[in-house]
From Swiss-Prot:
Full protein name: Phosphotriesterase-related protein
Keyword Hydrolase: yes
Positions with a binding annotation for a divalent metal cation 2: E175, H207, H236
PROSITE patterns for the chain: PHOSPHOTRIESTERASE_1, PHOSPHOTRIESTERASE_2
Gene3D superfamilies, per the entry: Metal-dependent hydrolases
Organism: Aedes aegypti
Enzyme class, spelled out: hydrolase
SUPFAM superfamilies per record: Metallo-dependent hydrolases (SSF51556)
GO MF term (any one): hydrolase activity, acting on ester bonds
Cofactor dependency: a divalent metal cation
Enzyme Commission numbers on file: 3.1.-.-
GO biological process: catabolic process
Record-annotated disulphide pairs: none
Residues reported in the UniProt entry to bind a divalent metal cation 1: H23, H25, E175, D304
Amino acid sequence: MAKVMTVRGPIDHPETLGFTLTHEHLSLDFHHFYVAPPPGLDVYVNKKITLQNVGYIRQYPYSSAYNVNFEDDETHDAVLKDVMQYKACGGGAIVENTSHGINRNLKLLYNISEACSVHIVAGTGHYVQAVQPDSVTHMTIEEMGDLYTKEILFGTQVDTAANETTMIKCGMIGEVGSSWPITSFEKKAIQATAETQCVLNCPVTFHPGRDKDAPAEIVRLYLEAGGKADKCVMSHLDRTILDHGDLLEFAKLGTYCQFDLFGTECSYYQLNNTGYMPSDEQRIQSIEMMLQEGYEDRVLMSHDIHTKHRLTHFGGHGYSHILNNILMRLSLRGIDIKTVDNITIKNPAKWLEMKV
């Protein structure tokens, strides 16, 4: 029987997960992506978030060392409150995408799941090469695949908040990160992911480099190594493939197409100087186009929260933004509740189910 593996154990009936965010972070080390602030602005961004500087930090989120520290106690307290709010607003599950290289925190995921009664799925896999130590980049494809298999089938021993020891199993591989061009290590990670997926029939999710050709190249490598398209999510398409024609061409490959930066609206995208960050309105337009072209069963939505300023405690929208603000806008555009449920409940459950 197909199940979904969460940090607190298997869910025998995947459809009971409820509303699911398929790409979030509850804790991670993102300091590698710090960007020096523009001249004269360091005095505003290099301090705690206040009413006086939050505007600067929203514009230059990666230029605040405080903001990109998403693994301190202050962040964890704020995340806990936001997940509680998410539950109160109708949320059922969160897929936590922090993988090896950015400091996954399984103990925290378990404790938050227990405290909030929200299903949380943890991921294995490797993030981009730039955050990996040499000991990891020298791993063989077989060693990487063995690690993924172990963390899915047998789990990792963790001490919980109740001073008990438990084995936490991962419920997917991801996010598997790659740059552009894709490095040799990242190609190994993609191949190891595909080979493991082929054996376990587990769900996987990829983080593409910031180039419109990156998603298709990842899928090519993944399929050639034996991975199944219908168990694969391509993340961040809203910031990667901006042209609707190109997006439809990618959709033909058969993966889930994820629009996971809802709530991120800024006039300058620091991590891609030659591109731009679409608005929520543009994300909705892309989803409308996908629905009109018959891809209702391939669309997923999320926020990819990974900096403090997007949590409600620090003036952000939190994990409830889609529930509170976007679903209403979808309804006003004539997208019926059945379609919304397919995108936010049925599609995630179908992607996450596996027989283990």
